Amino acid sequence: MKTLVALALVLAAPMTLAVDNMKAFPPAEEGMARYVIHVPEQADEAAWRVELQIGKTVQTDAANRYFFGGTLETETIEGWGFDRHILRQLGPMAGTLMAVDPSVPRVDRFITLGGDPRLLRYNSRLPLVVYVPEGVEVRYRFWRADDKIATAERG
């Protein structure tokens, strides 16, 4: 019985920690939404990154490349030392200007913020918390460094 109780405490501890950590993150302000990402534990978390993809699903032509303007800011929460990521405003959509056949139907596409990918540190002990305007989606995927390291040639 003691073993069962000890096992239950060990399994519940990370969940309790995650709930306690959420106290640091204020609820979303009016007109904003808060997204919370809990990532699974990995053996070597230093080799992993989380890529945020922030955007909206819109109807566009299939030929051009589109993106939204906007700046994802990172703020450290005073007194806690945790980071939160905030997109205060989704800017206008822009894209390439290739001519397309007007008779071709438009397609639904997820259009993201322009610029470099938003790669964040992987940490299974803390949630990734992202604040965005209402109507904006937050998607993510994982990146992992290869175990093989190549040596560059001098030249």
Predicted segments, located by residue:
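Short, surface-exposed beta-edge/turn micro-motifs
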Residues: 7, 34, 82, 125-128
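N-terminal export/targeting and maturation segments
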Residues: 17-61
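C-terminal partner/receptor-binding element of secreted or periplasmic proteins
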Residues: 121-155
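Solvent-exposed loop and beta-edge segments used for protein-protein assembly and interaction
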Residues: 29-31, 44-46, 79, 122-124, ...
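Mature extracytoplasmic domains of secretory-pathway proteins
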Residues: 46-115
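Positively charged n-region of N-terminal signal peptides that target proteins for export
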Residues: 1-4
